[in-house]
Amino acid sequence: MKLNFILSSLLLVLLTSCSPSETKKDNQIDPQIKKQIHILNERIIEGFVENKPEKVLTLCSDKLLGKREDIKVLMQLVSSRLKKQDFIILNEYYQKNASKKNIAVVSSGIKSQHDYQIRYESLNKEMYVVIGYFKDSADQKCFTFMYGKSGNNWKLNNLQAGILKIMNKDAIDWYQLAKSDYNKGYLIDAICKTGISTQLLKPANQLWKYRIENEILAFEQKVTKETYTRYHFPITVSEVITKPVIFRVYSQNIPEGYFPSILYTTSIDMNDIPKLSRECDKIHSKIGKLFKGITTNNKMILYRPMKSIPSGNEKAKQYGFIKKNF
C-alpha cells in the first residue's frame, strides 16, 4: 500500500513537471487569447499617447507597479510624439509552460538576417509578448510588452522601450548599407552608417538580440580600425589657407534625414559669420578628395566650426552650415 502511494506520487510529480511547452506566433495564436491581449494593449497604448499613467498602471502586475515612477517618466518623454493610429504590431507570441528557471525565449526565426530573439523573465505559466512600433516617426519607437496570466486575468509584467528603425531602416538595413559603402571604399560613410546600425541593435534593451548581432559588432570593429588607420584625426585641411582642423566626423539627424556632420576648429573669429561661411565653402570643395565618396554618396553634408576642440565643460559659440551636393 505504501509502495503504491509512493509510485502514484512519483507519477504525479513526473506528469506535472513534464507538462508540454507551447509557443505560438502571430496567426498561430488562438484568436480569443489574441483578442484579450489586444484589448489590454490598446488601453496601454492610449495611456502612453494621452500621457495618462492610470490607464497603464491599472493593468500592471504587482511587481511592475514597483517601477511606477520609471513608467511615468517614460510616458512623459514619449507621449507628445506618439499617435495611437500609428502603432503597428511587428510580432506577437503566446507561450505556455515555456520557461526554464523562469526564463523564456521567443524567436522570430532563424533564416532571415532580420531575425531576432527575446530572452525574458517568465513569471507565469501562460505568457504573451507583443512587439510593436510607431511608424510615423523618423526614429520609430519600439515597445515590447510582456503579459502574464494570473488566475483568469492577464497583467503586464514587463515593458521595454527603444528604437526599432531610423528612417524606416532597422539595424540590419543600416548594416547592409554600411557594408555596401565599405566595399566601395567609402570608409567615412561606412563608419557613420555602422554607428546608426549599432544604435538600433537593442529595441528591447538587453532582452533583444539579432541573429547577426555579433557579425555587426565585428564589422564595426573592423571598419573603425581601418578608418582610423587611414585617417589620422585631427586632420588639417592644408589646401584651405586658414588651415581648419577636422577632429570628428559622425552621422547627425536633421529633419531631412541622417547626414555626415564634420566638426572642425578654425582660426577665424567666431563672430565673423561671412568669413566662416567662405571658409566652409572652401572646405566643402576639398572634402570629397579628403574623404572618398562623401560628396557623391550624400545629398548634403553638415559642418560645425569651433574655436577649439570641446573639453566637455566649456560653453562656446557654435554655428552650423549645410552644404548640398545634389
Predicted regions and their residues:
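Alpha-helical protein-protein interaction scaffolds
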Residues: M167-V223
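Bacterial Sec-dependent N-terminal signal peptides
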Residues: M1-Q28
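Surface-exposed, charged secondary-structure patches
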Residues: Q76-Q140, N168, K225-I268
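Short, low-complexity N-terminal intrinsically disordered segments enriched in polar/charged residues
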Residues: C18-E50, Q160-I172
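Short beta-strand edge/turn micro-motifs at domain boundaries
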Residues: I131-N168, Q252-S261, S285-N325
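Short, well-ordered alpha-helical segments enriched in acidic and aromatic residues
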Residues: E50-K63, I191-G195
